[in-house]
Regions:
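Phosphate- and other anionic-substrate recognition elements at nucleic-acid/protein interfaces
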Residues: 1-75
Length: 75
């Protein structure tokens, strides 16, 4: 039996990311350091992941770079 994929919804803005997963939401600074920490926390779950975000005037670039660097799928 395969483990279901955890979908993580992310609303992107210039300063912050609004993250929603596991029936919780929180804000995360849209900066490399906080994003790297968040990616590590997600990977520690050791389950299939899929990040979902909407491109917003280029503000998603830090998120895309971090996800790619850590091997986390994003669409």
């Amino acid at each position: 039996m395969s483990t279901p994929t955890l979908f993580v919804g992310i609303d992107v803005s210039k300063e912050n990311l609004e993250v929603y997963f596991q029936n919780k939401s929180f804000e995360l600074l849209n900066q490399a350091g906080p994003l790297a920490k968040f990616m590590h926390q997600l990977l520690e779950l050791e389950i299939p992941l899929q990040l979902i975000c909407e491109a917003t005037a280029g503000y998603e670039e830090a998120l895309l770079r971090s996800a790619h660097h850590h091997g986390v799928p994003i669409s």
